[in-house]
A protein has these predicted regions:
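The feature primarily captures lumenal catalytic ectodomains
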Residues: 1-406
């Protein structure tokens, strides 16, 4: 994709042309190819460069959040306006580099969606459009905590300060602007659609630079001198649904198999640097399907990732985490619970279609009422005998990793 040149005094003024690509299922993306001014109080970009005298005033609206296919959440995303109209505010803050604008509204605050709908699309967009990393992030609808929580990672993409739209009152001028984020699908970086054949492993490398200790191999960490591999059990804190009802018994069994166990209950205030250090230096991550398993991005190659899959979420479990694990060269195991291990059996009975044939209820989509049953009303009581076999396999793979790193 060819970018417009930065305007200089030796060049003719760059025409400010507004264009939008609305051909994609998951996202729209718009451009202002020349000088423009942002009025944050109205969420409007004004094209300020010369325009063709035969071209009428153009107004485009975009909701720059990459879930265009999901009408309900998109209805909650604010429109940004792009216009070539004649009434243009004066500029207070001048930038020599372009703007990349997107929304951190929608599902932001859910750790999975922070990555799936925000940070991974940001990686794709930056590598596709701004490979020199010389641009300003302008983020709309960001919660107050968002810029600080992800500051270390955001500064892997750009050295310039982040502009949060709702906290600004001054107008900002840019040589050109891109509005929207490119996504390749759920937790996906498609190497055929991105320059230099980048993949999710390159995104993981950026996570390591942001949160890890550079030039330190995990085996040099004192935690890896131990004889027992470390297993991190990700648990849902004060959450409705997908809890392990016999957690204490499971933990005792994990220890008997030969692991040291760390209970990981992340929340909105959990330090990403501390989380990265814990997960990256451990040998196994285990958890019931849910947002916390997004931390599997922090695992190093060869680590074991064991996902416990409740009834009815098989497709999501593979699309969100299974394919990711295989692509990141993790030792991926999945434990699909049986009917008797689901708490739903007590309410609906083992012969109910919800338990016996969940695919028949989802063949035309995932209605909210069905999704809520599987995700919010279902807990798991693991079959200790059957689950022990998976733990033994995880232990074997973890010991193999330890031997490789010594």
């Amino acid at each position: 994709m060819q970018l417009p040149p930065h305007p200089t005094s030796s060049r003719l003024p760059v025409e400010s042309r507004i264009s939008c690509d609305r051909t994609h299922l998951r996202y729209d993306i718009c451009s202002i190819s020349g000088p423009n001014v942002l009025d944050p109080t109205t969420s409007t970009f004004f094209a300020t460069g010369p325009t063709s005298p035969t071209r009428s005033v153009l107004v485009e609206k975009i909701r720059p959040y990459p879930r265009k296919f999901e009408g309900l959440v998109m209805s909650q995303i604010k429109d940004l306006i792009l216009t070539s109209g004649p009434q243009r505010p004066s500029c207070k803050v001048h930038h020599k580099v372009p703007a990349l604008v997107f929304s951190a509204g929608g599902y932001t605050g859910n750790f999975f969606h922070d990555f799936n709908d925000g940070l991974i699309p940001l990686f794709i967009t930056v590598d596709t459009i701004f490979p020199d990393r010389d641009f300003v992030i302008v983020v709309a609808e960001a919660p107050d905590w968002w810029p600080s929580k992800y500051a270390e990672l955001l500064h892997m993409f750009t050295k310039h300060p982040i502009i949060t739209l709702e906290n600004e009152i001054s107008t900002h001028c840019f040589p050109y602007a891109k509005i929207g984020l490119v996504t390749h699908g759920f937790m996906t970086v498609n190497q055929t659609l991105i320059p230099n054949s980048k993949t999710l492993t390159h995104f993981r490398d950026i996570l390591g630079k942001a949160y890890g200790h550079q030039n330190q191999h995990p085996s040099s960490n004192t935690n890896h001198t131990r004889s027992r591999p470390r297993l991190v059990l990700a648990c849902r804190q004060n959450a409705a649904g997908r809890s392990i009802l016999n957690r204490d018994k499971v933990i005792r069994m994990i220890k008997r198999v030969g692991f040291d166990v760390v209970i990981f209950e992340p929340n909105a205030n959990t330090s990403l640097r501390k989380s990265y250090k814990l997960i990256h230096s451990s040998h196994v991550l285990v958890g019931v399907h849910g947002a916390a398993l997004t931390h599997s991005l922090f695992l190093r190659p060869g680590s074991v990732f064991l996902q416990v899959i409740p009834i009815g979420v098989e497709w999501a479990a593979d699309a969100f985490f299974g394919r990711v694990a295989r692509g990141l060269n993790l030792e991926y195991l999945e434990y699909r619970i049986g009917i008797e291990e689901s708490s739903l059996v007590e309410k609906y009975g083992r012969d109910n279609a919800l338990l016996k044939d969940p695919f028949s209820l989802q063949k035309n989509g995932w209605p909210t009422e069905i999704m809520n049953i599987y995700l919010k009303k279902q807990n798991v009581k693991l079959d200790l005998v059957r689950f022990k076999g998976y733990l033994k396999e995880a232990y074997r793979k973890a010991k193999k990793l330890m031997q490789k790193e010594t």
